[in-house]
């Protein structure tokens, strides 16, 4: 399944969470890469329900005396021009985003690497529909 979304600015919270060693380790183990410390937010033209796909759910954990919630992780390919970049949609247990906004992680800062700006449209490829 290919989904198109418009690049939008986020709150900057992804940067904090992705800078924490436990999250870095979790994502590296699941995805095979250490994600850039930040997410790329995409606004879709419809609601996104990760529960329709074969995602991986991480456990809650404690770090430096604080409790952190797990996330649902869905590996994807990010399609920009003729490039296919490994990435993932991440859906935290606690989120402030509407269901039309998805957060994407990748091994690099996608905005810089591909000169993306708010309003640009990119595509993502999702495999692993629960019905497959």
UniProtKB/Swiss-Prot annotation:
Its EC number is 2.7.1.161. PANTHER family: RIBOFLAVIN KINASE. It is an enzyme of class 2 (transferase). It catalyses: riboflavin + CTP = CDP + FMN + H(+). Its cofactor is Mg(2+). Catalyzes the CTP-dependent phosphorylation of riboflavin (vitamin B2) to form flavin mononucleotide (FMN). Can also utilize UTP as the phosphate donor, although less efficiently, and it is unclear if ATP and GTP can also serve as substrates or not. Pathway: Cofactor biosynthesis; FMN biosynthesis; FMN from riboflavin (CTP route): step 1/1. CDP binds at residues 10-15, 108-111. Keywords: Flavoprotein, FMN, Kinase, Magnesium, Metal-binding, Nucleotide-binding, Transferase. The keyword Kinase applies. FMN binds at residues 95-96, 103. Binds 1 magnesium ion per subunit. This ion is coordinated by a threonine and an asparagine, and by the alpha- and beta-phosphates of CDP. The keyword Transferase applies. Mg(2+) binds at residues 39, 41. This is Riboflavin kinase. It comes from the Archaea. Belongs to the archaeal riboflavin kinase family. Monomer. InterPro entries: Archaeal_Riboflavin_Kinase, RibK_CTP-dep, Riboflavin_kinase_archaeal, Riboflavin_kinase_CTP-dep, Riboflavin_kinase_dom_sf. It holds the Pfam family CTP-dep_RFKase. GO terms for biological process: FMN biosynthetic process; riboflavin biosynthetic process. SUPFAM superfamilies: Riboflavin kinase-like. GO terms for molecular function: magnesium ion binding; nucleotide binding; riboflavin kinase activity.
């Amino acid at each position: 399944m290919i989904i198109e979304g418009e690049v939008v600015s986020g709150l900057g919270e992804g940067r904090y969470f992705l800078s924490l060693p436990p999250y870095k380790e979790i994502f590296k183990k699941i995805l095979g890469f250490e994600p850039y410390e930040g997410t790329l937010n995409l606004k879709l033209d419809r609601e996104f329900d990760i529960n329709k796909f074969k995602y991986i759910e991480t456990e809650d954990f404690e770090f430096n005396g604080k409790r952190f919630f797990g996330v649902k992780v869905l590996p994807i390919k990010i399609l920009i021009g003729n490039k296919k970049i490994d990435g993932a949609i991440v859906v935290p247990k606690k989120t402030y985003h509407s269901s039309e906004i998805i957060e994407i992680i990748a091994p690099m800062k996608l905005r810089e690497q591909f000169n993306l700006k708010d309003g640009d449209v990119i595509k993502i490829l999702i495999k692993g529909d629960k019905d497959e």
